Amino acid sequence: MTVAQVIKPEPMAPSPTGFEPRIVAFVCKWCTYAGADLAGTSRMTYPPNVRTLMLPCTGRIDVSFVVRAFLQGADGVIVSGCHPGDCHYTAGNYRARRRWTLLRDLLDTLGVDLARFDLAWISAAEGAKWVKTIQSLTDKIKKLGPYESMHRLAADRTPDIAPRIESDLLFQVASQDGNTAPASPELVTAVSEALSSGHAKVVVGWTRSDTLSRPRPSWITTPEAARSLVEPSGSGNLARLLKNPHLRRILPLGIVARSSEVLSLNVLAQEAQVDPASIVVFAVADDGQFRGMVDLATASTTMLQNLPADRPVGFSDAVFKALDELMAKPPAERWEFWMEQSAKCIKCYACRGSCPMCGCDQCFTDKNQPQWFPTAADGPGNFAWHLLRAFHLAGRCVGCGACQAACPARIPLNVLSAAMARSALKHFGHQAGLDPKGTSLQSDFKPNDQEDFIL
């Protein structure tokens, strides 16, 4: 049975009390589903508004399930599973807990009504707790009424043919000043010698473009080509070129790296997407000073010093100021803001192409068996794309701003990413890219992770 079948049942007779909410429950097979079954066999009663979907473990409940449920007409969603320490798969609920912490903060940033999204630990012996939880959620949503704003979004299936692109308060244009000054002699010499000696077989850097008014990312393989390098002033992130499977086979690989590229390389190393031993870093400080040819560990030590500890690294002060201004607004205003921004999206995927972290073999938007979300640039398609992309980058985005600079619709993507980075730091003390030997945020957990929002 599919999610759509569960939350689109046969028409029910009109309720004598008026509005009857539709609630979708994603539950663990071993605990909560058994608890709900116990409630039934014990002849306990609770509202029939809930449609229950059983999955093997809460660790299997993807955030896309929650998004899909809301877009398919649910007025409320609840996720429930085993208590910590009782998971039949050892740590599935621990991983789920970290995932839901991040998702709640993302939904709050977007202005989604968090009162409609509950999480609970319910064991197989807690049939009474299941009844109480469903009764409480149903009563709460009845008071809130239908989720009209989400229903309107889900019904918006007509893409805007000519989206209106205007300057926004929260949008900040990344530097694209067209600087094509030649690279420093020290950098050119170091790259040339590395290619001559075999310390690097290919070097990724910035070169002058004959057609663009700004540097372009390129890779060179001969010592003579090193003279074509220019100062690394482009707004993109050179680490994204490492997504190229052909380039990644040419090892050892050199890269002209600023702090944003070093952070990105560390994240890729954490995820075993690159081998630090095969990477040669031509370190360039953010002020343009060449720091020498070093390995990734040394580059991390020398270039990531004196970073602020009170906010995520990589993001500018202006981005966090914009985020703070947004979060000071009521949820309804935040929702309207992001709906206006999302409506401008033309689904060109320039944000995906410019991001060194977006490297899946097949993006969820390209999957059509099944097709979970609309591919058109319509209301639900754009909303799901930006929400899930931001979530997938939680704990991974280094704040380089390449996505925002590449966006032709001028959507403030870095603000969403900053919200996720702040959530990762606040709840888990995680800073993306500081340690190449660290653990990826969403693949890790701690038994004492926050759970005060779980029933």
Question: Where are each of the predicted segments found?
Answer:
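Iron-sulfur-associated redox domains of electron-transfer enzymes in respiratory
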Residues: 1-344, 353-356
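Ferredoxin-type iron-sulfur electron-transfer modules in oxidoreductases and energy-metabolism complexes
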Residues: 107-109, 322-342, 360-455
